[in-house]
Amino acid sequence: MITISDKLINGTVAAQLTASLMAVSCITVTFCVNLTMVQDKANGTRKDFNVAPVSKEKIYLGYFLSTVANSLMVNGLAFVLCLGYLLKMGWYMNAADVLWVLFDMILLVLFGSTLSSIISFPLTTQGQLSAVGTIVSAGYGFLCGAYMPISNFGPGLQKALSYLPSTYATSLIKNHMLHGVFREMERKNYPDEMVEAIRDTLDCNPVF
């Protein structure tokens, strides 16, 4: 009979929840921040930039870098709060795990900034801004497997979602957040089949 401590169970659930939160937050916050570019077009602020002796490339680079900086600040604070939650529920991460998650966060913010810049570039009105913000905020978590593991979807949908980069980004951050949990399970000599099944269920082995 296998006995699993409440701390390990709570730590596993907390790590999965915080990983999903960070995976979604790094993209949705970035989208919301980058919508400033659309806001400037809609309210006419962009006209002031256009008459300034600054190239369009530098203007767009400024939007991109400001999006990255603001998103990193917001998501950095979210990450600190997530670490506090993990500390309360069940802490199994080491320093290397924390650094890897920080790297994942930066990678996701850069991906989100690039994606949001491409999508926001042709938008010019408040209505378009609201529509994109709503769609991304509501739908991204499902598409990347954060709200519900992709392993729970049907084979066809799993195959379709496997072509999206966000799927693997979410899996990456889950692997690093849950690495300490799986290490503890192996230390306690839990069956390999059980640990592997948990990995598969939580999309830590993204093979679709």
Placement of each model-derived feature along the sequence:
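Long, hydrophobic alpha-helical segments
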Residues: I2, A14-T36
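Short hydrophobic alpha-helical segments within the ABC transporter permease transmembrane module
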Residues: T45-R46, I59-V68
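Transmembrane helix boundary and interhelical loop/hinge segments in multi-pass membrane proteins
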Residues: T30-V54
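Transmembrane helix segments
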Residues: S120-S171
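Alpha-helical transmembrane segments and their short interhelical loops
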Residues: K56, T67-Y140
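Short amphipathic alpha-helical coupling elements at transmembrane boundaries
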Residues: N43-V51, T124, K159-S162, N175
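Short hydrophobic, aromatic-rich alpha-helical segments embedded in or entering the lipid bilayer
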Residues: I150-C204
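Residue-level recognition of transmembrane alpha-helices
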Residues: L21, D40, F49, Y63-F64, ...
